[in-house]
Amino acid sequence: MAAAAGGPCVRSSRELWTILLGRSALRELSQIEAELNKHWRRLLEGLSYYKPPSPSSAEKVKANKDVASPLKELGLRISKFLGLDEEQSVQLLQCYLQEDYRGTRDSVKTVLQDERQSQALILKIADYYYEERTCILRCVLHLLTYFQDERHPYRVEYADCVDKLEKELVSKYRQQFEELYKTEAPTWETHGNLMTERQVSRWFVQCLREQSMLLEIIFLYYAYFEMAPSDLLVLTKMFKEQGFGSRQTNRHLVDETMDPFVDRIGYFSALILVEGMDIESLHKCALDDRRELHQFAQDGLICQDMDCLMLTFGDIPHHAPVLLAWALLRHTLNPEETSSVVRKIGGTAIQLNVFQYLTRLLQSLASGGNDCTTSTACMCVYGLLSFVLTSLELHTLGNQQDIIDTACEVLADPSLPELFWGTEPTSGLGIILDSVCGMFPHLLSPLLQLLRALVSGKSTAKKVYSFLDKMSFYNELYKHKPHDVISHEDGTLWRRQTPKLLYPLGGQTNLRIPQGTVGQVMLDDRAYLVRWEYSYSSWTLFTCEIEMLLHVVSTADVIQHCQRVKPIIDLVHKVISTDLSIADCLLPITSRIYMLLQRLTTVISPPVDVIASCVNCLTVLAARNPAKVWTDLRHTGFLPFVAHPVSSLSQMISAEGMNAGGYGNLLMNSEQPQGEYGVTIAFLRLITTLVKGQLGSTQSQGLVPCVMFVLKEMLPSYHKWRYNSHGVREQIGCLILELIHAILNLCHETDLHSSHTPSLQFLCICSLAYTEAGQTVINIMGIGVDTIDMVMAAQPRSDGAEGQGQGQLLIKTVKLAFSVTNNVIRLKPPSNVVSPLEQALSQHGAHGNNLIAVLAKYIYHKHDPALPRLAIQLLKRLATVAPMSVYACLGNDAAAIRDAFLTRLQSKIEDMRIKVMILEFLTVAVETQPGLIELFLNLEVKDGSDGSKEFSLGMWSCLHAVLELIDSQQQDRYWCPPLLHRAAIAFLHALWQDRRDSAMLVLRTKPKFWENLTSPLFGTLSPPSETSEPSILETCALIMKIICLEIYYVVKGSLDQSLKDTLKKFSIEKRFAYWSGYVKSLAVHVAETEGSSCTSLLEYQMLVSAWRMLLIIATTHADIMHLTDSVVRRQLFLDVLDGTKALLLVPASVNCLRLGSMKCTLLLILLRQWKRELGSVDEILGPLTEILEGVLQADQQLMEKTKAKVFSAFITVLQMKEMKVSDIPQYSQLVLNVCETLQEEVIALFDQTRHSLALGSATEDKDSMETDDCSRSRHRDQRDGVCVLGLHLAKELCEVDEDGDSWLQVTRRLPILPTLLTTLEVSLRMKQNLHFTEATLHLLLTLARTQQGATAVAGAGITQSICLPLLSVYQLSTNGTAQTPSASRKSLDAPSWPGVYRLSMSLMEQLLKTLRYNFLPEALDFVGVHQERTLQCLNAVRTVQSLACLEEADHTVGFILQLSNFMKEWHFHLPQLMRDIQVNLGYLCQACTSLLHSRKMLQHYLQNKNGDGLPSAVAQRVQRPPSAASAAPSSSKQPAADTEASEQQALHTVQYGLLKILSKTLAALRHFTPDVCQILLDQSLDLAEYNFLFALSFTTPTFDSEVAPSFGTLLATVNVALNMLGELDKKKEPLTQAVGLSTQAEGTRTLKSLLMFTMENCFYLLISQAMRYLRDPAVHPRDKQRMKQELSSELSTLLSSLSRYFRRGAPSSPATGVLPSPQGKSTSLSKASPESQEPLIQLVQAFVRHMQR
C-alpha cells in the first residue's frame, strides 16, 4: 500500500508516539527497545530534526526517479509553504497520504491537477506537519515521565534512552526555545500566497504550543537532574528577556485564545527557575546546619548577578515565586550580607500575591497537563511552601487563606499527604495546620479545607479521623465578657463558673463545657478569642452543627449555617470515599444527611452546593449498601417517585402519574435558571451507583421513576439548558449515558420479559428505541471525527490523548453512545415494526451525511483506538440487523473509507483489536452486505483463454491482508496474535459458508493457501487445563469447518491437489488420533471442573461442533479424508464414547450436559456408520449404560434430545449382534431404568393427549388406510422422541431376554403395562400418537413370544385396550362415507394407522399362539368385534393388490390360521362368522390362484387399477436386500429399462405376498375340513361338523367373484405351484429377491418350501373334501361318480408331473418353517424329509386307487 503513495515512508513521529504509549501492535520489550535505538537521535534533535529548505535537497528531489513528478511538484510547494527541507517535504507528503489522506490513491492525481483541491491538501498537510512536530516532543515528555517509574513495563528501555539523551538534551531544547520565540512570523511574501492571516495565526499557536512543551520538558529534566548555578543565570536572563512568555517577537499576533499557552510558558519558566534553586536540598542543609554544602553557597559572583536581576523583577505575576524562592535562598545562605535585598525581594513577592499565583499555577497545570508534570510541580511548590513556613513568620506572609488554598492545591498530589503526616507537626505545613486549629471551631472552614486535602489514602483518612476525634481546645469568640466566668488579674485566663451547653438546639447529641474549665484569652479587634482547655470529638460537634441546621432550616440563618455545614459534609465525603470502613463511625452524621436533603430542598432558594455534597456522600454509601441507602432515600421525597404503582410499559414511558420529587423541582427552579448543575451531576452518579448495586427486583422497580425522569426530562433536552461553565454540558451527557450503559449491562435481568412489570433494562430499550431520547444518542454519535479532532487540537495539553481534557470527555461520551446503541439493538425484542431508532440509524441521507457514513469515518480517528473500534462494532451490528446497504450509505466515499479500513488492517503497528474488529465487521458483511463485501474483496475480472472468466486480487483487496495474516512463514516476522489469526480465519470461513465462489476461486489458486490455512491443525496445543488462549481452539474449529465445506460442496475429482496432499498428511501424521484425543481431554477437563471455571466454554463448543462435522464428513468421504483404517476408526469412536461419558456423568452442570449432548449426536452417527468395524460390543455397552444413568439424573427438560440419542445408540448396539442377557452389563438395572423413563414419558403423553382432548383439538380423522402423521409441535409422540425410542429400546432388550424373567420382575415392580395399555387405549380411541401406538404394539408383540410375557400382557387387560378402541382406527370417517381399503402409496415402513391395525392383529395371533386356550375368549371377542373389517379385507385382495392391502390380508389370515385350531369353540360362539370366513377363505384362495396363474393380468391390474406406475414403496422395499444387484435406482428420471426392471420387481413382490396369503389360507382351511386319516378310517365321524368348502366343479377358475371356489380351484393352485417350482429350478424367476433374504440360495430354498407347503395343503384339502362328498348321503350318487372320474384323471395327470419333478429332487415342506404350522394331528406328509418326497405321491396314488375301487 505504501508503494501507492510513491515509495516507502519512514516511521512518522505520531507512529513512534503510539508505539511508545504501548497502543500499537509492537508491545514486546525488544520491539520498544529497537524503536528507541532506531529513533533516539530524532528525539535528541527535537524540533531541529526538521531542516530548512536548501538547494541541494531540492536537486535530490528532482533527481529521485522513485517519486512521481506530480508528487515532487506538490512536495516543493509544501516545502515553500512550511519552510521545510524539500526531501523531508516529499517524505512528509508520503506519510500523510499513507496515514491521514481521506481519499483513494487514484483521487490524488485529480487533486493535484485541481488548484483549489491541491491548496486544501497543502493546508491539511500543514496540520499534519504541526502534529508531527508536537509528537516528537510528546515522545520525549513520555520518556521523562516514566523512565524512573518502577511500575511501568518499559522503564528499563526508557531509562536507557534517557541516558543517551541526557547530556545534550537541555542545551539543544533551550536553543530551540530561543529560536522559536525570536522567529519572525511567516508572510505571504516569504511563504507563498497560501500564508493568509488565518494560517499565520495557526502557525503562531503551534509556535506557542511548542515553546510551552519545550519548557515542560526542561522542567521535568531538571526535576531529575541538578541545574548548575551558571545555567540558572542563563535561563533567568533568557526568561527575563522573553518576559516569561509575554514578550514574544510576534506578540502582536496574540489573541485571547492563545492566553492559555502564554500563561503556560510563564508558569513553566517560573517553575524551572524555582526548581533550579534547589530549595529542597537548601532546606536539608539548613536543618543540618551545613549551609555551605549548597551549590549556591560556593558561587558568590553568580549570586550577585542574580541579586541584580531579581531587583529588576516585580512587574509581572510570574516573577512572584522566583522572587520568594531567591529571597529564601539568600536569607538562608547569607542572612547578614543581604538582609535589605532579601527584604525588598521578599516584600515584592508578597505584594505580587505569590500564594494566589501558585494556586492558579497548580490549578492550571492540573486541568491541562500530564500527571507527572503536575505532581512534579506540586513537589517543587511543596518544598518551597514548607521552607517558607518553617523559615518565616506566618503573619508576614499575607492573607492566611491564600496560603491554605495553595497548600490544598499542593496536597492534591496523592503522595504528599503521606509525607505531611510523617513530618514534624511544628515545621512546614504543620505550622499552618496548627494555626487553623487555633481558630476551630469558631472558624470551621479553614481547618476542614486543609484536612480534606490531607486525605489521600486509607492511612491518611484514618489519621484525619483520629485528629478530629481527639481535639483538646475549643476556641470561642466573645464580643463582651460573659457573666459566668471569673477572669485572672491580668485578664489572660478565664475560668467557667457554670457548665455551658454549646448547642442549645443540638438535641440528644450535645457538647457541654464543664464548670471550672480554664480558657486562654486573646484580644482581637475588640473581641475576646477564648481557647478553652476542653477535650471533645469534633465529629460530635459536626453532628450538633447539622442538628442546628435542621432546626434553623426555616429561618433566615439557614444560608449562614449552610456555610458551616458544607465543609463538614465535604470532609465526610472525602473520608468515606477514601476509606469506607470509617463510615460506620460517622453514622450519626451520615444518617442525618437524609433529613438534610428533605429539609433543604424545600427552602425558598435551596443551597444547591450543600445538597450536591449530601448526594455525593450518599453515592459513596450506596456503593457499599445500596439497599439501605435506597430505602432511606425513598422516605425523603428527594428522588422522583410514583404515587400509585405503574405496571404497564406505556404508562411508564409516558411518565404517567410520576412525580419529579425534590430533585426534579430543584433542577427546574434552581439549577436551570442559575446554570449550575452540581446536584444534577451528583444525582446521576447516585442513580448509577444504585443501579450497579444490583438491587432486588422490587427496589429496581422503585428506580423506574428516576430512570424515566432522566430519559424523558434530561436526555432529550440537556444540551439546550443554560450553562455557566464550559464542559458541564458534556459531563452531564456523559453521566446520563453511563447510567443507561450500566442499566443495559445488568446481568441479573437476563430474561427481559419474565416478570409482569417491565424491568429497568426493558424500559431503557423501549425509551431509546421509540422516544426522542434515542434521537439525542444518535446526535451524540453524529458528532463526527472532524469535530473531535478539532476539540483535541485546540487543547493546550502537552500529552495528547492521555489525561482528562474536553476532548477526552467528548470521546468518552461518543464511545458510550456507541455502546448504548449497540446494546439497545442487541437486546431489543424482535418486532415487525421498525423502531424510530433503527430507522434513524439506517436511513439514507443526502450527500453521504447519514449516520452510517459518519460511523464509518471514525476509522480516521487516531487519538483513542477504542473509538473507531466501537464505531465498527456498531456498524457490524447494524449490518446484521438493519435492512439497508452500508455500501449505498457510504456513497462516493465508499472506496476511500475502504482504503482507510485496509490501511489500518495492513499496518504493521496498528492496535490489534481494531484489526480484529475490522475483520469481524467484514465477516458479518459477507453474509449481509453483498455490495460492501465486493468492494472490499476488490476482485478484478479478465476473460481467460478458454472464454471463461478469470479472477485476480485487486490492489485494494482485503484478501491481501488476510493471506498475510494466515501465512505460517510470515507469522514470526509479522506479529499475528491468536485473536487476530482467529478473526482472519473466521472471515475466510464466512466466504466459504456464503459460497463466494469468485473469492474462493482466487484463494484456491494462491500458492500454499491450503498449507497455510491448515497449519494450526498440525501444531500441538497445550492441555485444556493450561490453555491461556482459547481463541486458538476457535481458529482450529473454523479451519475444520472450511475443510468440511470444501469437501462437501466441491465435486470429488475437482478438489485442489494441495488440499488432497494436506488431507493425506493429516492422516499420515496421525492428526485424527491427536485431535480425537485432544477433544476427549477437553471433555474430561470440562467434566472435572464441572463446567464452572470454564470461561472459554463457547470455544470448546465450537471445537466439539467442528470436530463432529469433520468426522461426519469423514464417514461419508472416507477415501478423500484417508480415514479408512478400521483401527483408527475404532479408536476415534472410543474417544468420543469416553468423552461423552465423562461429560454426561456430571448431571448437575448445564454446561457439561450441553457439550455432552453435542458429542452424543456424533456418537450415534459414528455408531451407525462404522458399526461393522467397532469390534466388541461389550466395550460399548458398559460406557453407554453409565451415560444413560448420568442422563437420567440430569434435568429432564434439558436432556430430552440427549436421552433420545442415547436410547437410539443402545438400539443400534443391540442390533449389531445376537446377544444374551449375560452379555449385557447390569441388564436388569438397565431394563428398570428404561422402564422408569418410559413410565414417566407415557404418563406425560397420556396427560398431553387428554389435555388436547379437553381443548377439543383432536386431529380430524383421516382416510383410514392413509398414514395420519401430522407433525405436532413439541409433541411427545415424535418418531425420534424419548417415548417412542424408549419403547423400541425396551423391545430390543426384551428380545434378548429369552425366558422373560427380568421383564417379569420389572412388571411386578413398576405398573408399566397398565400405564402403556391405558395410554394405548386413549390413543387408539382418539386416533392420536401414531408413533407411540406402533412402538407399543411392537413391544407387546415381542413380550407375547414368551409364556410369562404373554401372560403378563393378557393379564394387564390387553383386550379392553385394543379390541373396541381399534374400531376408531378404521371406522367411518367424519364425512360419513364408508372406507374401502385404498392403495397406500407410502412406504409400508412408515408408521400408519392401517399398520397399527395389522400389528394389533399380529399381537392377537401371537398371544393366542403362546397362551392357546387361556386367551381364546379374548381372541374370539376380537374377531367378533372386527368381523366386518376381517371379511372386507379377505375380499379386497381380488380388487386391490397394494402392499398395504396384501400385508393386512396376510396378518388377518395368519390370525384366522391360529384361531382355526379352535374350530369347535369358534363354532360354538360365532357359528355364522365362522361360516362366512370359511367361504371368504375359499374365494381368497381362488383370487390368489387366479392372480398368480396369469402374470400378465396381474401386471395389467397393478398398472391400471392401482394408478399409473407402481407404489414407490415397492421400489424401496426391493432395494433393501444388499444382494439385490438388479434393484432399481430410485431416481425420478429412470431410463426405460430401469422402469421396466422396477415394474418387474414390484410384480415379484406382489406375487410373493399373494403366495404367502395363499399358503396361510390353505393351512387355515385345512382345519375346517375333516382330518384325512379320520375320514378315511373312522366310519363314525360326525360329518355335520364340517361344511363343504369347495364346489363340485373341475373347471379352471376364472377371475370372477360370482364363480364359487371348487375342486378346479385347488387343482389350479397345485398347477400354479408346480409351474413356479419349475421356473425356479430353471433360474428363470428373480422372484427370490422379493423374499428379502440375504442370499439368492436362501431365497430359493424359502420359496420352494412355501410352494411345497401350498401343494401339500392343496392335496390334503382335495382328499379331505372329496371324502366329505363321498361320505355325505345327501350328495347324489351320480355326482359322486362323476367326481371320482374327474378327480382320478386330474390327479393322475398331476401325479405324473409331480413324479417328474421329484425325480429331479424337491424341497421339503415348511410345515414347521416359515409359517405357523397346524398344531393338530400332523400327518406323515408334514414330516416328509427332503430326501424322499414319495410319501406325498404315495398318498395321492393310494387315494386315487381308493376312488377307482
Swiss-Prot record:
Gene Ontology cellular component terms for the protein in this record: cytosol; membrane; nuclear envelope; nuclear pore; nuclear pore inner ring
GO biological process, one term: nucleocytoplasmic transport
Keywords: Acetylation, Cataract, Disease variant, Microphthalmia, mRNA transport, Nuclear pore complex, Nucleus, Phosphoprotein, Protein transport, Translocation, Transport
Biased composition (Polar residues): 1719-1732
Modified sites of kind Phosphothreonine: 1712
Job of this protein: Component of the nuclear pore complex (NPC), a complex required for the trafficking across the nuclear envelope. Required for proper protein transport into the nucleus.
PANTHER family, per the entry: NUCLEOPORIN NUP188, NUCLEOPORIN NUP188 HOMOLOG
Protein family per UniProt: Belongs to the Nup188 family.
Illness association: Copy number variations of NUP188 gene may be a cause of heterotaxy, a congenital heart disease resulting from abnormalities in left-right (LR) body patterning. Sandestig-Stefanova syndrome: An autosomal recessive syndrome characterized by pre- and postnatal microcephaly, trigonocephaly, congenital bilateral cataract, microphthalmia, cleft lip and palate or high-arched palate, camptodactyly, rocker-bottom feet, heart anomalies, specific brain changes such as loss of periventricular white matter, thin corpus callosum, and delayed myelinization.
Protein name, as recorded: Nucleoporin NUP188
Native species: Homo sapiens (Human)
